Each structure stands twice: as structure tokens, then as C-alpha cells.
Amino acid sequence: MRNSIISIAMKKSEIFDILVNKVCEVCEVRVDTLIHGSKLQSVVDARVLSVQYLRRIGLTNDDIALIVMRKIKGDMTWCPPIQEVKAKAKGVQRMFDSYSQRCLDSYAFCIMSSEIKDFCREQYKDMYLSWMKQLPTK
């Protein structure tokens, strides 16, 4: 059973890596800067886009929080306390919720989002068709 949990976690981690690399390429930020965070608008935008599309292709807030915490720690097998994961997951949810406002505020953000959406459709066609949610509207 533990092997199947590790296998699923590795798949989610691989999805995370592929999508985050693409977002970083589109937003012109470094992956380590996105992981560790920054107040630069380009990094904030990249984080919002990453969370938005990771959620759309099936990762939960907890999945994203755990992967980020493990990447910061440098150990993909580390199991942090659940309270810390849940606290980080709340921040992930705030980023997910801020997507609509960023689209309203920035045409460039919409263009970047469109490029990532096209990438997801191509890269994760099966998952995209089964898990893609509607764009949030306000």
C-alpha cells in the first residue's frame, strides 16, 4: 500500500514539475524563485497561474502544499506535520481564489493564462478533459 501511495505522490510531483516549469518559462521567472516565493509581481502571477492550473488538472490544495514544502526542504519523502500542510494549503486556496481578480486587472496575465491553458490541453489531454473546471467568473 505504501508503494502505491509513493507512486501516486511521484506522479503528482512529476505533474507539478512539468507545469511549474512551463509557467516559469511563460512568466520568465526561475523555478526556485517561484517555489520559495517573492513579492515581485511576475513571481506572484506565476504562483497564481501554477496553482490555478495544478488545481484544474486534479491536484488538491493539500497536494500542492505538500509538494512545495518537500521541495523547500529538499526531500520528496519528508512528511511534515498535517497542521503545517493544512496551514500552507489555506494560502494555496487564497492564490486559487485570486485568479479571477488578476484576470480582470491585467491583460498580460490573461495572455499568459491562455498560453498555459493551451499547454495543459496538449500535455494532459486525458486529465484535462476529465478534470478541467470552468474558469471562475465574477
Listing of model-derived features with the role each one plays in the protein:
Residues M1-K138:
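Basic, alpha-helical nucleic-acid-binding regions used in initiation and control of genome expression
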